[in-house]
Amino acid sequence: MGHTRRQGTSPSKCPYLNFFQLLVLAGLSHFCSGVIHVTKEVKEVATLSCGHNVSVEELAQTRIYWQKEKKMVLTMMSGDMNIWPEYKNRTIFDITNNLSIVILALRPSDEGTYECVVLKYEKDAFKREHLAEVTLSVKADFPTPSISDFEIPTSNIRRIICSTSGGFPEPHLSWLENGEELNAINTTVSQDPETELYAVSSKLDFNMTTNHSFMCLIKYGHLRVNQTFNWNTTKQEHFPDNLLPSWAITLISVNGIFVICCLTYCFAPRCRERRRNERLRRESVRPV
């Protein structure tokens, strides 16, 4: 009896086809690796290069487009430049430096992929002469978060709050203890409409009768920042409530009052006699 072949394991009829496919994939990988990546901080200056040169004489026959995700940034047609409103007064076109654009005072919204397209007039038509892509990453580092704590009245529960602000991109906050993620009470993330920067805060309740070590971890993009909060219980003797029954407390109180009365009765005559002797002594020494 012959062996049956499992489906999907038939040998290739044309091994050269697989080799050709590998060559195509390698070529695509090489092409994709040509994308330029630029990373800058908020409010910094970013220079995005088109990687192509055009002489002054060729400008009249050349069209240059800079766009971000299909939205126009800048155009140069027949030597006339036009900058779109979002980039006006903060974008410079550097023709002599590989047709680069220079974006001033970076905003978080400037992040994205930019395309530079160069068209040249040839044989009664504009044909594409060059295409380049530049990926711009804009970041703002979050400061080390702060953790404040306060006690909730009439309970053994304590609450801690972790917060930080002024970072980008959008953060994700989590609480960890011994490597395990905990459930927070309330986590809020907000973005300033003007600066486009984020703020984040979160609350966590815990039982203050046991020791704890919490980590507040904030991830944003490929970066992270964290703060640790340690709680150590104080070693105190805890006496049970109502150590003595009420009748015993009453008996002790009555006995205490009785002892005080006895002491007063015993010492009162001595005090009176001492005062009487003092009075007689003063009278005996009084001059006639």
UniProtKB/Swiss-Prot annotation:
GO terms for molecular function: coreceptor activity; receptor ligand activity; virus receptor activity. Residues 1-34 form the signal peptide. Glycans are attached at residues 53, 89, 98, 186, 207, 211, 226, 232. Pfam families: C2-set_2 (PF08205), V-set (PF07686). A lipid is attached at residues 261-262, 266, 271 (S-palmitoyl cysteine). The chain crosses the membrane at residues 243-263. Palmitoylated by ZDHHC20; palmitoylation protects CD80 from ubiquitin-mediated degradation, regulating the protein stability, and ensures its accurate plasma membrane localization. Changing residue 271 to S: Loss of costimulatory function upon T-cell activation. Disulfide bonds join 50-116, 162-216. The keyword Phosphoprotein applies. It comes from the Eukaryota. Expressed on activated B-cells, macrophages and dendritic cells. Residues 35-135 form the Ig-like V-type domain. Residues 264-288 are cytoplasmic. Costimulatory molecule that belongs to the immunoglobulin superfamily that plays an important role in T-lymphocyte activation. Acts as the primary auxiliary signal augmenting the MHC/TCR signal in naive T-cells together with the CD28 receptor which is constitutively expressed on the cell surface of T-cells. In turn, activates different signaling pathways such as NF-kappa-B or MAPK leading to the production of different cytokines. In addition, CD28/CD80 costimulatory signal stimulates glucose metabolism and ATP synthesis of T-cells by activating the PI3K/Akt signaling pathway. (Microbial infection) Acts as a receptor for adenovirus subgroup B. Homodimer. Interacts with CTLA4; this interaction inhibits T-cell activation. Interacts with PDL1/CD274; this interaction blocks PDL1/PDCD1 binding and thus PDL1/CD274 inhibitory function. Interacts with CD28. This is T-lymphocyte activation antigen CD80.
